[in-house]
């Protein structure tokens, strides 16, 4: 009861510590003095030796608390459960397993290990046919190298259609046009996460 909170075990107070750890995971750098190394560490070959170059191209991963839920018998009672939803965006070299482990390894999660459960959302909504195909709610990072044949084919097609210069353009516009098309990335998830991200089909 709220009149004697010391007799209870306040789940919201415990979650408050987890929330601060999640914020640190997103905002900290990766220096040796940090207990929680920030997600920016994946841009460093020390932490991501096989994929750091792709991670630098794509950008660092991020995490943010997007929802919080609790249960309590009433407004004048100690909360007996609390859960959060974390929106975690991955970069090259990360997997959903590594992302879950990062949360499990947060100091607050270890401190309250017997009370903490870290899991992934599952999609289980029925299709229009009524069929339910349960699957993990994660969207793997993917990248197509600029040197890949299908990417180069698109660049060649662009050159064939538009060239590299505009004969009618002034010098400033011509300079901006040089080297086009720009082969770059979007910094958010796309529909390619299943076809390319899971199955490697460009």
At which residue positions do the language-model features occur?
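Metal-dependent amide/peptide-bond hydrolase catalytic core
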Residues: 2-202
């Amino acid at each position: 009861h709220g009149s004697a909170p010391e007799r209870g075990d306040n789940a919201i107070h415990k979650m408050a510590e987890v929330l601060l750890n999640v914020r640190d995971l997103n905002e900290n750098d990766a220096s040796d003095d940090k207990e929680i190394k920030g997600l920016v560490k994946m841009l460093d070959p020390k932490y991501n030796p096989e994929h750091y170059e792709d991670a630098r191209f794509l950008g660092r991963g991020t995490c943010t608390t997007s929802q919080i839920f609790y249960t309590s018998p009433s407004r004048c009672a100690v909360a007996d459960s609390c859960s959060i939803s974390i929106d975690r965006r991955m970069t090259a070299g990360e997997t959903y397993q590594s992302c879950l482990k990062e949360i499990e390894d947060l100091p607050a999660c270890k401190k309250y290990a017997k009370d903490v459960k870290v899991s992934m959302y599952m999609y289980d909504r029925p299709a229009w046919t009524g069929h339910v195909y349960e699957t993990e709610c994660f969207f793997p990072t993917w990248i197509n190298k600029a040197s890949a044949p299908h990417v180069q084919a698109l660049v060649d097609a662009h050159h064939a259609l538009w060239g590299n210069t505009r004969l009618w353009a002034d010098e400033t516009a011509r300079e901006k046009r040089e080297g086009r098309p720009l082969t770059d990335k979007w910094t958010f998830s796309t529909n390619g996460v299943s076809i390319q991200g899971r199955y490697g089909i460009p």
